[in-house]
């Protein structure tokens, strides 16, 4: 990496927050309601980090209307499992310090905006619309969610779009990611990246 970092891009699920169990339980409950026998272990082993529509399609749900219905139902059920979500506090504190020194921080995720906003509110870290008075230094500068770009990870589009919106180059950007598809997207973006591994 050459020159100072001006922008940090964070994946959300599995990087900034450990949402593995909450996502697995919410998807399992959603699909069980619809008669599909997904287990928590199967979701975590094969699908965690994959955009919802792609996951449901690869799971064998071909009807787009049914996939959309299940996606919306999962968003409804997801907050019921937030007691299992944990903030990656060292990474969050690092990003807060980076922002205090003038850097910019975005969340760039394949997840839905509603899921990210709900989880951030639960964790007490707010989102870009949270007034500073209510959440001092606890904001991010932007959020790009799955539907905001045409091609999801492993394509680098989401990272490149966040850089474009901030007016920075890949050489001025640092990405934190956990999943194989996210790391592939980070590499393809041309930015420096750090792999995050959360404890089991």
Predicted regions span which residues?
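Short, acidic loop-to-helix structural element flanking the phosphoryl-transfer center
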Residues: 79-117
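Active-site neighborhood of HAD-like aspartate-dependent phosphohydrolases
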Residues: 1-42, 188
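A metal-dependent, Asp-based hydrolase signature
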Residues: 34, 48-78, 97
């Amino acid at each position: 990496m050459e020159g100072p970092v001006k922008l940090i891009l964070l994946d959300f699920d599995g990087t900034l927050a450990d949402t593995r169990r909450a996502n697995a339980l919410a998807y399992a409950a959603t699909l069980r309601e619809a008669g599909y026998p997904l287990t928590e272990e199967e979701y975590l082993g094969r699908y965690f980090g994959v955009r919802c529509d792609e996951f449901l399609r690869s799971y064998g749900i071909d009807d787009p209307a049914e996939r959309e219905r299940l996606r919306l139902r999962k968003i409804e059920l997801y907050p019921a499992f937030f007691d299992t979500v944990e903030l990656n506090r060292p990474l969050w504190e690092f990003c807060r310090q980076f922002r205090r020194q003038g850097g910019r921080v975005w969340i760039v995720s394949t997840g839905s905006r509603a899921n990210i906003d709900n989880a951030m509110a639960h964790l007490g870290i707010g989102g870009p619309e949270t007034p500073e008075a209510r959440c001092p230094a606890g904001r991010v500068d932007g959020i790009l969610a799955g539907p905001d770009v045409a091609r999801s990870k492993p394509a680098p589009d989401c990272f490149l779009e966040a850089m474009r919106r901030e007016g920075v180059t890949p050489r001025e950007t640092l990405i934190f990611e956990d999943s194989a598809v996210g790391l592939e997207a980070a590499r393809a973006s041309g930015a420096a990246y750090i792999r995050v591994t959360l404890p089991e």
